[in-house]
Design a protein with these regions (language model features):
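Amphipathic, non-transmembrane alpha-helical scaffold segments
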Residues: 15, 61, 65, 69, ...
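Basic, helix-initiating cap at the start of DNA-binding domains
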Residues: 1-42
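HTH DNA-binding helix-turn interface
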Residues: 5, 26-31, 44, 51-63
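Amphipathic alpha-helical packing segments from all-alpha helical-bundle domains
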Residues: 118-160
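Hydrophobic alpha-helical connector segments
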Residues: 78-109
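Alpha-helical elements of Rossmann-like donor-binding domains used by nucleotide-donor carbohydrate transfer enzymes
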Residues: 17, 21, 89-92, 96, ...
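Short, hydrophobic secondary-structure boundary micro-motifs
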Residues: 35, 109-112, 120
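Short, basic, alpha-helical segments at the C-terminal edge of helix-turn-helix-like DNA-binding modules
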Residues: 36, 66-73
């Protein structure tokens, strides 16, 4: 007899387990160490289970790369809190973005230029549905910018 389907909360927990396992492997052993089997083993699941949540390793890698934005989100909100001028906020956001991107180039490349960059808006929304605490305390304009998928959309959002 087949197992009953997982509830949404259980699916989100398993989804988070895989993302956390992949993120830990990326952080501790580098991108080259990332395989579906290693991620599944670290998460405590069969590698076939991963395909219920991710299309392939690249898809999982994009989600795991989102972990690098946690510090970025928190610090960006803190630094932008006192600046009211939209252009100055825009310039600061880009300086901060570039500094973060140079610290984790593989993660930023995967997100904005990788195989699934065209799906980034959907990926961002799905990710923050499971990890809402990583957004921190953001004002509405920064929150809207962070949930845009493309860099063009992010720029437009910050300049409005």
């Amino acid at each position: 007899m087949a197992r009953p389907p997982y509830r949404a909360e259980q699916r989100n927990q398993i989804f988070a387990c895989f993302i956390n396992a992949a993120s830990e492997l990326m952080e501790n052993e580098g991108m080259e160490s990332l395989t579906l089997r290693r991620v599944a083993k670290r998460a405590g699941y069969n590698s076939a289970t991963l395909y219920n949540y991710f299309k392939d390793l690249d898809h999982l890698t994009v989600y795991a790369s989102m972990k690098y934005f946690e510090d970025y989100n928190r610090n960006l909100a803190r630094y932008l809190a006192d600046e009211q001028d939209a252009f100055q906020r825009f310039l600061f956001m880009w300086r901060f973005f570039c500094a973060s991107a140079f610290r984790h180039p593989h993660a930023y490349y995967n997100l904005f230029y990788g195989k699934y960059s065209g799906e980034l808006t959907e990926i961002i929304h799905a990710y923050y549905e499971v990890f809402p605490e990583e957004l921190g305390e953001l004002d509405d304009s920064v929150l809207e910018m962070l949930t845009c998928g493309s860099l063009v959309e992010r720029n437009w959002q910050m300049l409005q």
